[in-house]
C-alpha cells in the first residue's frame, strides 16, 4: 500500500467513527505506529473501545487491557483482540516475559503513578521485545493555542486559566520532555531505539479548535451512543482532503507529542 493510500485508509477509518479532534490526533498516531513491526504476542495497554487497535492491527492483536468496562464491551464487539482484560496497568495479571510486543497509545499522560506501569511493561515484555508508545510532551500546552494573540488582547491570565482547565478536563498529569521519558524507560530496561516529535504547532491549533467543531459529535454520542451517527457526512473525499496535510506532515523540530520505539534489554537495568 502506498503512503497516500495508507493515509486515506487511516483517515477514513477514523472519520467513520470519531469526532474531528480525535480524527486529527489518532490518525497521526496511527500512521506513526503502523510503521512499526510487532512480533506476536501483542499486548495493547489502554486499548479503550478497540477502535485505534483495529486501525493499526488490521489482522488483530492478542490482548487488550483497559480498566474501563464499558469500553471493553465495545472492544469485544469489534473482535480485534483475542483476549480482553479489565485490569490496572500498574499490576497486570500476566506472567513475566509473556509478550513479544507492547503498545500503548496516548495513555501514559493520564496515569498519575506512571512508574508502576512502565515497570510492569518491562516485566511482561520478553528480552528483545518491542515497546511502542505515544505521549504528550513538554510543548503540549505551549502549542495548543495562539499564546501571542491572547497576550495582545491583555488576556494572559485567562489564557493560563483556560489551559489549566483544558488539561484538567483532559486528565493530563505528565508534560515531560523526551529526556525525562527516556530516563523512565531506561531505568527499567526499556532501551529507546528512536523517538520523534509529532503534532506541530499548526496541527496542534487545528486539534484544539476541532474540539469545539466536534460539539455536535458529543451531542450525537449522548443521544445515539455513537460519535458519528451518519458516517457519509464525514467519511468522504472532502474531509480526507482537508485533514490529510496533518497526517502527512514531516516530522517537526518540536511537537506537542512524542512517539517512542524501545526494545527490552536482556541484561538487568542499571540501578
Model-derived segments and spans:
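A C-terminal cap/extension of S-adenosyl-L-methionine-dependent methyltransferases
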Residues: 149-150, 183, 194-271
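A short glycine-rich, Lys/Arg-flanked "PGG" loop and its adjoining helix->strand segment in the class I
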Residues: 115-130
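Conserved N-terminal segment of class I S-adenosyl-L-methionine
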Residues: 1-91, 253-260, 268-270
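A conserved beta-strand element that flanks and buttresses the S-adenosyl-L-methionine
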Residues: 103
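Acceptor-substrate binding/catalytic loop of class I
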Residues: 164-180
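Short catalytic micro-motifs in class I SAM-dependent methyltransferases
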Residues: 106-110
Amino acid at each position: 500500500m502506498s503512503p497516500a493510500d495508507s493515509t486515506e485508509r487511516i483517515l477514513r477509518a477514523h472519520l467513520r467513527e470519531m469526532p474531528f479532534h480525535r480524527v486529527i490526533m489518532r490518525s497521526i498516531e496511527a500512521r506513526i505506529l503502523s510503521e512499526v513491526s510487532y512480533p506476536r504476542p501483542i499486548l495493547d495497554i489502554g486499548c479503550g473501545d478497540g477502535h485505534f487497535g483495529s486501525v493499526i492491527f488490521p489482522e488483530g492483536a492478542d490482548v487488550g487491557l483497559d480498566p474501563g468496562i464499558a469500553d471493553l464491551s465495545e472492544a469485544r464487539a469489534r473482535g480485534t483482540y483475542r483476549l480482553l482484560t479489565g485490569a490496572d496497568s500498574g499490576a497486570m495479571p500476566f506472567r513475566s516475559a509473556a509478550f513479544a510486543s507492547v503498545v500503548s497509545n496516548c495513555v501514559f499522560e493520564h496515569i498519575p503513578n506512571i512508574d508502576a506501569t512502565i515497570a510492569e511493561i518491562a516485566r511482561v515484555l520478553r528480552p528483545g521485545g518491542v515497546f511502542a508508545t505515544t505521549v504528550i510532551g513538554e510543548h503540549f500546552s505551549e502549542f495548543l493555542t495562539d499564546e501571542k494573540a491572547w497576550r495582545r488582547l491583555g488576556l494572559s491570565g485567562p489564557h493560563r486559566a483556560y489551559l489549566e482547565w483544558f488539561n484538567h478536563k483532559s486528565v493530563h498529569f505528565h508534560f515531560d520532555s523526551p529526556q525525562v521519558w527516556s530516563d523512565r524507560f531506561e531505568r527499567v530496561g526499556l532501551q529507546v531505539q528512536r523517538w520523534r516529535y509529532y503534532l506541530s504547532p499548526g496541527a496542534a491549533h487545528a486539534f484544539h479548535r476541532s474540539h469545539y467543531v466536534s460539539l455536535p459529535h458529543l451531542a450525537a454520542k449522548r443521544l445515539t451512543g455513537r460519535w458519528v451517527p451518519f458516517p457519509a457526512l464525514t467519511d468522504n473525499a472532502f474531509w480526507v482532503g482537508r485533514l490529510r496535510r496533518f497526517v502527512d506532515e514531516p516530522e517537526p523540530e518540536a511537537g506537542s507529542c512524542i512517539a517512542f520505539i524501545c526494545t527490552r534489554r536482556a541484561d538487568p537495568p542499571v540501578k
